[in-house]
Amino acid sequence: MAQRKELLKAHAFTQQRLVAALVDRDPDNPTPPLRRLGIGTFVSILVAAVLVGGFALFGYLTKPSTNAWSQDKPVVIVDTDSGVVFFTLDGKTIFPATNITSARLITGGDTIVKATTAALASAERGPRYGIVGAPSQLPDKSTMTAFPLRVCSLPATKNVRYTVLDTHAPGVTSDTAIGLEVNNHTYLVVGGMAHLIPNGSPLLGNATSLKGTEAFLRALPQGQEVKPFSDATTGNKALRGQNPVGTIVYTGDQTDKASWNYYIQLIDGYSAISYLDAMVNNQTPTAVQASYVASNRSETQNTATPGLPMGPVTFTSTDTTKTSVCATYTADSANPKITIGDTVAGPTDTKATPAVATYDRVTTAPGGGALLRSLGTDADGATFLIWQGQKYGIPDLESRTSLGYASGVNIGTVQPALLSLIPDGLPAGIALDRTHANHPA
């Protein structure tokens, strides 16, 4: 007669076959049908337990120390519960700061710690210090990109244009010569440099002058005026040379104007000038043998207007009054490249009357900023933080170091006038330095 133990085994075997037949349609499957489900459940629970334990350990290790802020040196303290920024100079008394920028300037910015509100509850409090209006967040230096830097003039309505500035703009390779009309004055923009010319001058030919803004003009390097030759000896017989003083002459193949070299007859001989210098005099150049010019040169070998190319210049035939015109600076050139028709976003605040003293919009890379300095400034001299469409002056290397920008940041050098047109983030006379930050607010 079967024993109870054998009956139980037989019952279990029969039950397993019934379940296998129902689930797997195979009563002879030796593997229990729910085994994989059980193993999967067990492994999932085990992995979840490991993850929970790992996060718990991470939270324990990264939990702000209750007394990490109490050091015998200046420390910036960030309250992780409230977001309030404090600083301490002696590890005992803590002072609220108007912003992280001010706290870094006061302490030197070397040490920044986090603490909970409870950890700071027993600390002695001082008055609030800092620069009201200074940035409440500083861009990471890895996001600080100045070039390519682009200033664009955009059509708004008839005879109304906006001027915008973008850092970290797309690069350009082409360069276009244009005419620019601002405040009833006409300029040639050649090689990225603006030259004043007489109104009604033939230099532009049939090109349409862009009726631009003063802000766009001031963003360009200013070259010397291109004007007709004027001298008390004009028309007199020259001491050297066969032409009257002031005569424009050329050498080269008479059938190939591209080969012509231009000169002006001075009292003591011939002096080289550019194509545009020749054209502004509104004369028909006289052909002279190159050998004769070479043997009768003036002591003033070259009187061309500085910054102008010596050869012919073709101005764009595009109607610049109806499209964007941009000047793009790069790190390796003091003069920008001029492009026409770029797709550029306009200002978010579309005012009926665009700003004159500032750009209508200033944009940096998303989440980033830029550091700029004026042309001619020493390496350790004043720089400007461009952040959230405004500029903040940083007067010296010490202040820049406190803000974390002493090294690892490419500082863009730009024209002083360009820099002056970026809206100020602080009142006149206030800069990001320890002197201004270390005052009760």
Task: Describe the residue ranges of each PLM region.
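Short, surface-exposed polybasic-aromatic patches that bind anionic ligands, especially phosphate groups
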Residues: M1-A441
